[in-house]
Structure formats: C-alpha cells, structure tokens
C-alpha cells in the first residue's frame, strides 16, 4: 500500500547548522532512546545584524501606517464633511444676515416714498370729500324742508281734527245735557199731573168703597145678633151710613205754565254750524302760508350750498420736505438689532457645534488609534499562532485565516458572548458570519457616516428650534415698537393739512346751520305757533259766547260753562304749552369734521406699516414667504441642516436595510430553511451540508481518529470511570499514515481541521505568557464550534476517507466514536446536533441558560473538590497500577482483560516527549527517559511518591493505542520531510464559545489541587509550566514497514529496546508480586 508524500519543503544548505538539524516530522515530537540525552547545540536564528542594516518594507502595513491612515478612517470622514458643512453654513449665514438687513432698510425706504405720497393725499381726499359733503348737505336741506312741509300738513290736519272733535263734542254734549234735561222736566211735569189726578180719584173711590164696606159689616153683625135674640124675640136695627159723592176730587189738575216754558227752551237750542265754518277758515290760512314759505326756502338754501364755499389743501405745502428727508426721518432710528442678534446666535451655535465636532473628532481618532493598536497586536498574535499551528500541523483552512485576520478583535472577544446566547454550533457560526457582515468596512463606514452625521445634525436642529422661538419673540416686540413709531411719524406729516381743511368745512356748515334754524324753523315757529295759539284762543272765546247766549240766565249756565272748560279749555291750555316748547326747541345742529378727518386710522396705518413688519418677522398668514428676514435667516440655516439630515437618514436607512438582509440570511440559515422545507414537504435531505444526518457512503468519523490512532491512551480514564472493555481488540497488520487536510473544501467550518475531539483540546501554555494566552483565546472558538466532537462539518471526503477502515475499539470515551457506522450507539448530546436545528430564539434561550449555569461549579469540579477534601494527596501507590500514566501494554490494561485478547506478537514501545525540551540538557542524572522500576527498587532508591493528575471526568485528549506506524523506506534522507503524524495536542481551536476559557480555568484549578504535575497526555495548560519527575510514555505501535520497507538503523535499535521492555512482566501487576 502506497502512502502519499507530504510536499517537500525547500531547505537552504547554507542555513543548516551541524548538530542542530531542522525539525522533521514524525520525530519532531516523538523520540525514544534508552540512552542519556545527547547534548545539542541550541539552534539560533541569524542575528538581525547579518540580514541588513535597514529594516525592509513588508507586503503588509505595520502599526504606524495604520495609525496614520486612521485620520481618514470612514468613521472620521463623515465628521470632517459635517464640520466643513457647518463652516460653510456659518459663513453663508453671516452674509445672508447682511443681505437681509439691507432688505429691511430698503423696505423702509420704499415706505418713506409711499409716505411722501401720503402727504399729498389730504388735498385729493378733501376735494372728494367736499363733493360728497355738498351732495349730502343739499340732500339733507331738501329732505328737511320736505319733512317740515309734511309735518305742517300733518299738524294742520291734526289741529282741524282736534278742533272739529271738540266742536262736535261740545255740540253733542249740549244736545245731551240741555235737551235731555228739558225732556226729563217736561215728562216729569206731565207724570206728576197725571199722578195727582189719578191719586185723588183713587182716594175718592176708596173712601166711597170703605163707607160701603163698613155698612155691610155692621149689617152682618146686626143680623148675627138678631139670630141670637130671636130666641128671645128680640130684633135690633142699626141705621146705614150715607156714601158721599166727592166730585171735587175727580177733576183736580196741575198748571202747564212751567211745562210750556221747558218745551219752548228745547225747541230754541243752537246747532254751532257757523262756528265750525269760522274755525276751519282760521286754522287753514296760516298752515298753507307756512308750507309755501318752507318750500321756497329749502330750494334756495340747497342751491346756494356748493363747492365754492368749501376749501381744499394746497400743493405748496408739499415742497417743505422732500422724499429723502422723509425717508431719513422714518428710517433713521429703525431697529434692526434683531437681525444682528439672530445672526450672532446662529454664529455662536455653529461655533459651538464645530468645536464639539472637533473635540468628538479627536476623541474618536484617539479611540480609533487605540483600536488600531489593539487590532494590530491581536493580529500579530493571531499570525504568530497561525504560523505556529501551520509549522506543527501543516496547512489548514485559508478562508478561516482570512476571517481571523480581517476581524481579530471579534475573534478575541466574541467567543464568550456568542457562547452564552447560542447553544448550537451552526447558530454560533451564523452569528459569527453576521458580525463579520456588520464589521465589514463598507457596512461600518455606512453606519458611522449616517449615525454620526444624523445625530450631529439632529442636535443642531433641537438647539435651533429653541433659538428660533427666542428670536421670534424678540423680533415681535422690536417690530411692534418700530411700527408704532412709524405710524406716529406718518400721522404727524399729514396733521396740518387735515386741520386746515376741517376748520374751513366746519365754518361753511355753521353758516348754513344758522340759515336753517332762522329761515326754516324760525318762520315756522314764528308763524305757526303764534297763529295757532291765537286761533285756539279765538275759538274758545266764540264757544263761550255761544254758551252765554244759550244758557245765560238759566240754571244750566254754570254747569255748562264748567263742563266746557273741562272738555275744551284744558286741552287748549296744554296745546298752547306744546306750541311754546316747539318754539323754544325748533333748531338743527349739522355735523362738523374733526381735525384728523384726513388722517388715517390706527388700523390703516398699521396696515401700511405691515410690509416692514412682514419683512422683519413675517406676515403670519401661513404662506411660503411669510417668515420675514428673521425666519428667512433661520430657515436658511435650518434648510441646510435638514437637507443634510435627510441625506444621512437615507444612508442610515440603507444600513438598516443591509442589517435586515443580513438578519434574514442568519434566520434563514439558523432554522428558517428547515421550517420552510418542512412546510413545503421537502425531505430532510435538502438540509445544508454538514447539518443533516450522516450518510453511510461517506463516513463522518475519520478512521485514524478512532481505535487505530497511533497516540491513543485510554487506559487511565477507563479505569477511573470504572468501565470494562466492551469488545476485544483485534490485531491490525498495518495502519495508514494520517494525512494533512489542506482545507481546500469550501464547506469546512473550522479553522484547524481537527480529526479527533481529543486532539482538539486546548494546548497548554504558560499562564504568564500573554501571547500564548491570546493565541489560545483566538483558537477557542474553533474548539467550541466542533464541540470537541472531531466531526468534519461536510459530507465531502478526503483522499484517505475511503481507504482507512472503521473498526470499533476501546477508547477513553464512554461511547464509541464510530457513531455513523458502528453498532455501538452514542447517546450523547452531540448526536442531537445533527438533527434539525432549533429556532434561533430557542437556541438563544438555552444559550443564556447555559451561560447562567457556567457561574456555578460543574460536576467534575465538585468531585475534584471532594477528592481534595476527603483524600490525601494521591500517589502512584494509592491509585494503583491502573491510575499511573505509564507505558502499559494493551493486554495488561485490565485485570483479566488479556484473556479475551487474541494472541499476537509483542510490539515494541517508545516514549513521547515535549518538543520544547529538544536541545535542552536535563538536570537529572537519569537522563531524559528514566527507567521504570518495581516498587521495591523504587523504595530502595529513595523514591518519593509524587502527586499525579487523575483526570476526573475529563474530556481531554488522551493517547490512543493499537495503530502501527509503518517504516518509511522512501525517505532515506533524514533531512528530507517525512509524512507527518497527527500531533499529540492541537492548539486552541478557533470557535466562538467559552469552552477554552472554562477548560483553562478548570485545568488550572485541578493543577493547583494536584501539585502541578500532570500526565503529558492530559489537557492541562500548566503541564509544561513544571518539570515532571516522571515522564510517562504513551504507547504506540511501531510495527513492520509496509511492503517490506526497512527503517533506519536508529529506529531499529529503538524498536528492539521497546520490544524487550514489552516482554517484561508488569512490575505493578499481581503476577509480578506473586513472582516476587
């Protein structure tokens, strides 16, 4: 069977120093010799003086150029551009303030020119006012005359009605009183006469009837008496009274002289028809004359009131002040301080913003310089770690190297964070991709440009809003004072003309007012009131004469006279009082003009001065150009800031879109794809490579990582756990040399392609070494990503996958490593990782839960603490042969275990030492490899027991057994590269969780608990920190070379010596003790 050769390295013969050959695999880390160590001359690299006097340039940037380039970092460029914009806005604001002040003064000058025109306004206003006043006055005179004529006509009708009413009332009253009285008297006289006659006749009849009745009564009584007396025969007779005639009472009457007088008076009463005609003539004559006089007077007065009697201001008064003088008067003390104050406030705001931006620029630059220094340091440590790994292990994943070098800070600090929030390796890998995506220079530049720019502009806008409110309030008060002053000056310019015009107009109106009072109301009062009064007096006199003629000398004269005064006389008296009041109040007052008739009102003047106020603070009507000079000044500054804010906001939105795209990709690859496929009914085989179940045709476990690993020691850990062999070892006549994975597969997720979870443990280093600590911390994410499983996260095979058989063997693990193709199950948590991924937030929850659990001691830590408390310091004797990490044969690892093993030829063994001890003289006389003695000889040699590391519940890598190392006859030259063996330890794998940190701290605690001396096969980071007193050798099989190849002479002697040791009895076994 042929073995592929590793690519040969070019070795310059001039650089080879005798006795110090370059390190060659596989003997760089493995050596075996029974002889004492041979002193070596330390190999020293050429001193810098041999190379060159000057340090040449490298194909990469060192620290100083990187710090120099931070001045133009994408984080600083937006701030520099923002500062430039602020400086430009500040200069443009100052120039705009000067321009706006000029515009306000120009507006005031224009108003002054308009005010000069306003001074000419009173003449033209007076002319127009005169025309309207003449028209109104003429109409008023005519209307007053017409009103007076109508009033007089109405009064005439009313007087006639009143006079006729009282005349008719008087006549009717006389008819009612006199004729009624007379009729009553005549009727009474006749009734009395008839009553007297009837009464006397009735008396006569009654007397006669009474005498007749008396006679009858007497006769009746006598008759009754006689009937009684007839008994005695006695009759009484009484004589009757005679009835008188009484004829003188029958024709008695009253004399008719009085009655005849009353009848004559009733027929002789007057009708007052002549009085009515006379009164109508007396009333109508004066009223008709008054109406005619008023009509002629009103027409003459209306015609005489024209424009000739009203004056107007002359144009000569305008030459006193020119327009320029008026402009100086109006605009000389115009307050424009509000513009200056606003400009100064904006300038101060810009200066403060620029200063803060410069300060922030310096702070960010300092932070970037520190960041670049830290990044450079981490990058150097990473490069050193990668070089060391590559020198020891060969090439690995170059793309992983790119990720580490691009983002060394993320590699250093993201492991703990991602390990706490994500439980599954796939989720951690996706989140690591997301962080790299966000940390890309383009994405970072976009974020910093948009964020810094947006925040700086927004802070300025907030300060500008407060400044705008203060400027507006100050501008309003200033403009109000300026407007009041301007209105006062404009009114003072037109006050004289208005006063002259008002005086001339009022004089003309006063003359016509006198004419109206004297000619219209005077004639009416003098004529109508006096005439009417005399008419009423004459009317009353005529009525009294008629009553005197009719009732004079009678008993009715006084009642009738009193009644007439009550009915008519009192009314005439009240009418005379009314006429007297009219005479006293019959005049008119025509309205006159005030002295400011030609001046504009305050509202009008404010309206004229509004343009200046609008130019200063805006009109306030909500238009586009109503902000005024102050608003324009602030709006100019604000608009520039808003344009920049919009630009930065768009850039921030683009970054958010990129953020969401990256987040969607992470969610899709963290379980979203599986859910989508499940919803569509797609089989699970459509899962991404490396995350689905293992396929049988491509084994996922490397054969050389299992039972036939050349460095695989499961002895001590099996004995500590108390397990027994589950199967018998089989003899293998050959073993393949493990290959070096060059990492060409694009689907590989790990930086170092670990073929075994034991080999993926963190490599020990000195605790005081910052470089080694950094290397280990950078390598920790890869270790955690593989979860110490040793699986390759891809289904593609390497050139050796199909050539190396899989065989179940005993290991230090509790379960078989052949999970894919072995009948032995592996019910560990790692097998669940190949199932369908949990959702991202579920993983995040479990990750947080695991992070909390990490603060508490683990089970292994508690057990170790219990061992430290309850047991003394363990030695080789206390642990027994099964706990001593010494060289053992497979057949003697277990008591009785060799009975189930097939017989096979004993094979030699050889020791593995630390490669760092090469070329170092050992202090012990026993040499590099002390011989293992029986207990009796150890006691005789003053052997002191020493503490060893029992590795409780350890998951660290151990040395396997059972794989044959073939001899390589194809490389007779010892200086030529040999096919490499897999290293005993893998240094700090690169992944993103805290497994390395926890294992590092746990190993440190265990080392301190056990004295600091551990097995070289353990994962303790402090192994090389102390010189062990006993170097235990792990067993490997050094078999016969394949295809008849011959090993070197030195190798043959080593094999022979190891074979002799193998044939010895176990000095720590029961058989050996019985033999003693």
Curated annotation (Swiss-Prot):
<dbReference type="GO" id="GO:0005886">
    <property type="term" value="C:plasma membrane"/>
</dbReference>
<feature type="compositionally biased region" description="Basic and acidic residues">
    <location>
        <begin position="997"/>
        <end position="1010"/>
    </location>
</feature>
<comment type="similarity">
    <text>Belongs to the PRM1 family.</text>
</comment>
<feature type="region of interest" description="Disordered">
    <location>
        <begin position="796"/>
        <end position="834"/>
    </location>
</feature>
<feature type="region of interest" description="Disordered">
    <location>
        <begin position="1057"/>
        <end position="1076"/>
    </location>
</feature>
<feature type="topological domain" description="Extracellular">
    <location>
        <begin position="1"/>
        <end position="66"/>
    </location>
</feature>
<dbReference type="GO" id="GO:0043332">
    <property type="term" value="C:mating projection tip"/>
</dbReference>
<feature type="topological domain" description="Extracellular">
    <location>
        <begin position="456"/>
        <end position="646"/>
    </location>
</feature>
<feature type="glycosylation site" description="N-linked (GlcNAc...) asparagine">
    <location>
        <position position="295"/>
    </location>
</feature>
<feature type="glycosylation site" description="N-linked (GlcNAc...) asparagine">
    <location>
        <position position="476"/>
    </location>
</feature>
<feature type="glycosylation site" description="N-linked (GlcNAc...) asparagine">
    <location>
        <position position="526"/>
    </location>
</feature>
<feature type="transmembrane region" description="Helical">
    <location>
        <begin position="433"/>
        <end position="455"/>
    </location>
</feature>
<feature type="compositionally biased region" description="Polar residues">
    <location>
        <begin position="874"/>
        <end position="886"/>
    </location>
</feature>
<feature type="glycosylation site" description="N-linked (GlcNAc...) asparagine">
    <location>
        <position position="533"/>
    </location>
</feature>
<keyword id="KW-0472">Membrane</keyword>
<feature type="glycosylation site" description="N-linked (GlcNAc...) asparagine">
    <location>
        <position position="235"/>
    </location>
</feature>
<keyword id="KW-0325">Glycoprotein</keyword>
<feature type="topological domain" description="Cytoplasmic">
    <location>
        <begin position="372"/>
        <end position="432"/>
    </location>
</feature>
<feature type="topological domain" description="Extracellular">
    <location>
        <begin position="160"/>
        <end position="350"/>
    </location>
</feature>
<keyword id="KW-0812">Transmembrane</keyword>
<comment type="function">
    <text>Involved in cell fusion during mating by stabilizing the plasma membrane fusion event.</text>
</comment>
<feature type="transmembrane region" description="Helical">
    <location>
        <begin position="139"/>
        <end position="159"/>
    </location>
</feature>
<feature type="region of interest" description="Disordered">
    <location>
        <begin position="963"/>
        <end position="1020"/>
    </location>
</feature>
<keyword id="KW-1003">Cell membrane</keyword>
<feature type="transmembrane region" description="Helical">
    <location>
        <begin position="351"/>
        <end position="371"/>
    </location>
</feature>
<feature type="region of interest" description="Disordered">
    <location>
        <begin position="874"/>
        <end position="899"/>
    </location>
</feature>
<feature type="topological domain" description="Cytoplasmic">
    <location>
        <begin position="668"/>
        <end position="1076"/>
    </location>
</feature>
<feature type="region of interest" description="Disordered">
    <location>
        <begin position="1"/>
        <end position="31"/>
    </location>
</feature>
<feature type="glycosylation site" description="N-linked (GlcNAc...) asparagine">
    <location>
        <position position="266"/>
    </location>
</feature>
<keyword id="KW-1133">Transmembrane helix</keyword>
<feature type="transmembrane region" description="Helical">
    <location>
        <begin position="647"/>
        <end position="667"/>
    </location>
</feature>
<feature type="glycosylation site" description="N-linked (GlcNAc...) asparagine">
    <location>
        <position position="602"/>
    </location>
</feature>
<feature type="topological domain" description="Cytoplasmic">
    <location>
        <begin position="88"/>
        <end position="138"/>
    </location>
</feature>
<feature type="glycosylation site" description="N-linked (GlcNAc...) asparagine">
    <location>
        <position position="548"/>
    </location>
</feature>
<feature type="glycosylation site" description="N-linked (GlcNAc...) asparagine">
    <location>
        <position position="306"/>
    </location>
</feature>
<dbReference type="GO" id="GO:0032220">
    <property type="term" value="P:plasma membrane fusion involved in cytogamy"/>
</dbReference>
<feature type="transmembrane region" description="Helical">
    <location>
        <begin position="67"/>
        <end position="87"/>
    </location>
</feature>
<feature type="glycosylation site" description="N-linked (GlcNAc...) asparagine">
    <location>
        <position position="251"/>
    </location>
</feature>
<keyword id="KW-0184">Conjugation</keyword>
<dbReference type="InterPro" id="IPR026777">
    <property type="entry name" value="PRM1"/>
</dbReference>
<protein>
    <recommendedName>
        <fullName>Plasma membrane fusion protein PRM1</fullName>
    </recommendedName>
</protein>
<feature type="glycosylation site" description="N-linked (GlcNAc...) asparagine">
    <location>
        <position position="496"/>
    </location>
</feature>
